[in-house]
C-alpha cells in the first residue's frame, strides 16, 4: 500500500471524508505511485471532476457536509503528505469550491454558509481555511495563482445581494484599501452576468446598490481618486455616479449615527463577532438592523 494512503487512514474521521477519499483515489493510480511524478497535470482533472460533480447539484446540507469535510481534512493533516502535493491539492480544492460558489452558482445562501463555516479562521489571512481570502479563477483554469478574491469578483460583477452578505461579515472593513472595491464597482468593464431565473439583472441598478452598501460601511470615499481614474480615460458604469455617494462620505461632516455604527462594528469585528454579535446587543431591533447594514 502506498505510504500516503496509509498515512491518510491514520487520521480518524467519524465517517468517510470526501477529501481523504479523493486523495486515496489519486495515489492509487499507477502513474502516481512515486511522489516525484506528482504534479498539477496528473491529478488536477480528477480533483476538479470529482468536486464539480458534487457542487453542480449540491444543496445547502450537502455543501455543509463538503465544507465540514474540507475543514477536518486540513486541520487533521496528520496525513503528512509531501509538502508540495499537500499545498497543490488544497489549492486545487479551494479554487474549485470558490469557482462553483461564486462564479457558477452565485447563490447568497451558499456564500453565507461558506462564511459561517470558516468564520473562525478569517482573522488570519495566511490561514489555508480562511477561504474568503483565497484567490480563484472566475474562468476556471487549474492554477488560481493569477486569480482574484471573492470580494473583488463580486465587485467586478456587481452582485449586490452577495456583496451585502460579505459586507455584513466585515470583509470590506478588513480590506487594506477598500477604495479599490469602490473603484472596481464603478469602473470595471461590464461583462456577461450570472443568470438568475433566466433573466439578466440590470447591472447599472446593481452597481448603484453596491455603492450604497459600501457607503454604509466606510466613513470616507475618495471622490478625488475616482476623478483621477476618470481623467485617465476610464468610463464609469453609472454616469451620474456622484448621486449615489452621500455627500457625508466625501465633503460634509460624517453623520454621528454612522460614526457610532462604525465604532460598534469595529469593536465587534476585532472580536470576530460580525454579524451575529449584533443581535446579542440589548438594543432595539431597528438599531440592530442599522448596525447590520440593512439601512
UniProtKB/Swiss-Prot annotation:
<keyword id="KW-0040">ANK repeat</keyword>
<keyword id="KW-0833">Ubl conjugation pathway</keyword>
<dbReference type="GO" id="GO:0000209">
    <property type="term" value="P:protein polyubiquitination"/>
</dbReference>
<dbReference type="InterPro" id="IPR001496">
    <property type="entry name" value="SOCS_box"/>
</dbReference>
<dbReference type="GO" id="GO:0061831">
    <property type="term" value="C:apical ectoplasmic specialization"/>
</dbReference>
<dbReference type="GO" id="GO:0031461">
    <property type="term" value="C:cullin-RING ubiquitin ligase complex"/>
</dbReference>
<dbReference type="GO" id="GO:0160087">
    <property type="term" value="P:spermatid cytoplasm removal during spermiation of flagellated sperm"/>
</dbReference>
<comment type="similarity">
    <text>Belongs to the ankyrin SOCS box (ASB) family.</text>
</comment>
<comment type="pathway">
    <text>Protein modification; protein ubiquitination.</text>
</comment>
<dbReference type="InterPro" id="IPR036770">
    <property type="entry name" value="Ankyrin_rpt-contain_sf"/>
</dbReference>
<dbReference type="InterPro" id="IPR036036">
    <property type="entry name" value="SOCS_box-like_dom_sf"/>
</dbReference>
<feature type="domain" description="SOCS box">
    <location>
        <begin position="243"/>
        <end position="295"/>
    </location>
</feature>
<dbReference type="GO" id="GO:0150147">
    <property type="term" value="P:cell-cell junction disassembly"/>
</dbReference>
<dbReference type="GO" id="GO:0035556">
    <property type="term" value="P:intracellular signal transduction"/>
</dbReference>
<dbReference type="InterPro" id="IPR039147">
    <property type="entry name" value="ASB17"/>
</dbReference>
<dbReference type="Pfam" id="PF07525">
    <property type="entry name" value="SOCS_box"/>
</dbReference>
<protein>
    <recommendedName>
        <fullName>Ankyrin repeat and SOCS box protein 17</fullName>
    </recommendedName>
</protein>
<comment type="function">
    <text>May be a substrate-recognition component of a SCF-like ECS (Elongin-Cullin-SOCS-box protein) E3 ubiquitin-protein ligase complex which mediates the ubiquitination and subsequent proteasomal degradation of target proteins.</text>
</comment>
<feature type="repeat" description="ANK">
    <location>
        <begin position="146"/>
        <end position="176"/>
    </location>
</feature>
Amino acid at each position: 500500500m502506498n505510504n500516503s494512503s496509509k498515512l491518510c487512514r491514520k487520521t480518524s474521521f467519524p465517517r468517510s471524508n470526501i477529501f481523504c477519499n479523493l486523495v486515496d483515489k489519486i495515489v492509487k493510480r499507477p502513474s502516481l505511485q512515486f511522489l516525484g511524478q506528482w504534479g498539477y497535470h496528473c491529478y488536477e482533472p480528477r480533483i476538479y471532476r470529482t468536486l464539480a460533480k458534487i457542487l453542480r447539484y449540491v444543496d445547502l446540507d450537502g455543501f455543509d457536509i463538503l465544507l465540514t469535510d474540507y475543514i477536518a481534512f486540513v486541520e487533521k493533516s496528520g496525513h503528512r503528505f509531501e509538502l508540495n502535493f499537500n499545498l497543490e491539492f488544497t489549492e486545487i480544492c479551494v479554487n474549485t469550491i470558490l469557482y462553483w460558489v461564486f462564479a457558477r452558482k452565485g447563490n447568497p445562501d451558499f456564500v453565507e454558509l461558506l462564511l459561517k463555516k470558516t468564520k473562525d479562521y478569517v482573522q488570519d489571512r495566511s490561514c489555508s481555511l480562511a477561504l474568503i481570502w483565497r484567490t480563484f479563477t472566475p474562468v476556471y483554469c487549474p492554477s488560481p495563482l493569477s486569480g482574484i478574491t471573492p470580494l473583488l469578483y463580486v465587485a467586478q460583477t456587481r452582485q449586490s445581494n452577495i456583496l451585502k452578505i460579505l459586507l455584513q461579515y466585515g470583509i470590506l472593513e478588513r480590506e487594506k484599501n477598500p477604495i479599490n472595491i469602490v473603484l472596481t464597482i464603478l469602473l470595471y468593464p461590464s461583462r456577461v452576468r450570472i443568470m438568475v431565473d433566466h433573466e439578466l439583472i440590470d447591472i447599472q441598478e446593481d452597481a448603484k446598490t453596491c455603492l450604497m452598501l459600501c457607503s454604509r460601511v466606510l466613513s470616507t470615499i475618495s471622490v478625488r481618486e475616482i476623478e483621477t481614474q476618470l481623467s485617465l480615460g476610464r468610463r464609469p458604469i453609472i454616469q451620474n455616479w456622484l448621486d449615489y455617494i452621500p455627500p457625508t462620505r466625501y465633503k460634509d461632516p460624517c453623520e454621528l449615527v454612522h460614526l457610532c455604527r462604525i465604532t460598534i462594528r469595529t469593536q465587534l469585528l476585532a472580536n470576530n463577532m460580525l454579524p451575529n454579535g449584533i443581535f446579542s446587543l440589548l438594543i432595539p431591533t431597528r438599531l440592530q438592523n442599522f448596525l447590520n447594514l440593512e439601512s
